[in-house]
């Protein structure tokens, strides 16, 4: 049995919260383990002057941590699952999917306005093309802009800016105790979340069987099935976290329901569909459901929309 575990994490306040949460859960189940954190700076933490959609997104917040994992300098990595590319590097595996926080997005506005109350031509801050596409589909008058940085930095920059509102994930806002700043929690029929939003993905080396078994105590089957369905859909569409794709799955008593959205950046074109499957009793069946819905979206024209976006 291992005596020490080293967790690799980004150094942002939210990433540290996630790593400390993981450490606490593992310590509770394995009190004999000496668990340490190793802080790692990622490309996404350094390149703050460009929109995420312009940088490219294949492992922007994960690749540097994965290098340390492959080099055996850390034993596991804790990621926001929505930041994890759908293809993991050779030799690595997502060994646990934690219970999800609320997956919805929220509006933070200067004077408490909700989506309907925001003034005409309001300036909205978000670094997500998924949010931009869905919001412009509802409010084409909005002027969309970008605020980068960790959550604390974004709140500071927002308060000092001329933006009227910004859109964030409820999970991060709640975890860092900014809940009192929320003007509105947006329902899924308004804004579908990012694939994997609200869950943590715990990554290990495939050949490190001891660590894989240790982190299994944090795996939530509901979360695993739902996020694997969402990630399979994204992978089949060859999308990334900076492509306007939203997805949300629920799982109860063997029945998996998956909703998805693909849209143009300007919000003028949007494709939505959903699927319900019974007797989903294995992760592979959840992934198969995601692929099936991706195929339906392609038949509806998702490929054409995504091809146009990739040219931008």
UniProtKB/Swiss-Prot annotation:
Pathway: Porphyrin-containing compound metabolism; protoporphyrin-IX biosynthesis; coproporphyrinogen-III from 5-aminolevulinate: step 2/4; Porphyrin-containing compound metabolism; chlorophyll biosynthesis. The modification S-(dipyrrolylmethanemethyl)cysteine is found at residue 241. CDD domains: PBP2_EcHMBS_like. It comes from the Bacteria. One of its GO terms (biological process) is protoporphyrinogen IX biosynthetic process. Keywords: Chlorophyll biosynthesis, Porphyrin biosynthesis, Transferase. It catalyses: 4 porphobilinogen + H2O = hydroxymethylbilane + 4 NH4(+). One of its GO terms (cellular component) is cytoplasm. Its EC number is 2.5.1.61. One of its GO terms (molecular function) is hydroxymethylbilane synthase activity. Binds 1 dipyrromethane group covalently. It is an enzyme of class 2 (transferase). HAMAP family: Porphobil_deam (MF_00260). The porphobilinogen subunits are added to the dipyrromethane group. Tetrapolymerization of the monopyrrole PBG into the hydroxymethylbilane pre-uroporphyrinogen in several discrete steps. Belongs to the HMBS family. Monomer. PANTHER family: PORPHOBILINOGEN DEAMINASE. This is Porphobilinogen deaminase. It comes from Prosthecochloris aestuarii (strain DSM 271 / SK 413).
């Amino acid at each position: 049995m291992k005596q020490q575990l080293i967790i690799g994490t980004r150094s942002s306040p939210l990433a540290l919260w996630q790593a400390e949460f993981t450490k606490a859960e593992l310590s509770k189940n394995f009190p004999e383990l000496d668990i340490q954190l190793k802080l790692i700076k990622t490309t996404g933490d350094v390149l703050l002057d460009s929109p995420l959609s312009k940088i490219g997104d294949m492992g922007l917040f994960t690749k540097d941590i994965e290098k340390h994992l492959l080099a055996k300098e850390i034993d596991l990595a804790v990621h926001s699952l929505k930041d994890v590319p759908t293809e993991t590097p050779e030799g690595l595996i997502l060994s646990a999917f934690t219970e999800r926080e609320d997956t919805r997005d929220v509006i933070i506005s200067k004077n408490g306005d909700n989506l309907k109350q925001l003034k005409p031509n309001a300036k909205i801050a978000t670094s997500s093309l998924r949010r931009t596409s869905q919001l412009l589909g509802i409010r084409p008058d909005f002027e969309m802009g970008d605020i980068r940085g960790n959550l604390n930095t974004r709140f500071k920059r927002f308060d000092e800016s001329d933006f009227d509102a910004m859109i964030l994930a409820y999970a991060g806002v709640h975890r860092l105790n900014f809940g009192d700043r929320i003007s509105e929690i947006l329902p899924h029929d308004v804004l579908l979340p990012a694939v994997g939003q609200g869950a943590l993905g715990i990554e290990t080396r495939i050949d490190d069987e001891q660590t894989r078994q240790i982190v299994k105590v944090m795996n939530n089957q509901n979360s695993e099935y739902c996020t694997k369905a969402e990630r399979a859909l994204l992978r089949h569409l060859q999308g990334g976290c900076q492509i306007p794709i939203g997805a949300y799955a629920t799982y109860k008593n063997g029945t998996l329901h998956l909703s998805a959205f693909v849209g143009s950046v300007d919000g003028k074109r949007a494709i939505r569909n959903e699927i319900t499957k019974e007797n989903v009793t294995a992760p592979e069946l959840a992934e198969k459901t995601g692929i099936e819905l991706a195929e339906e979206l392609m038949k509806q024209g998702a490929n054409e929309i995504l091809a146009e976006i990739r040219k931008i």
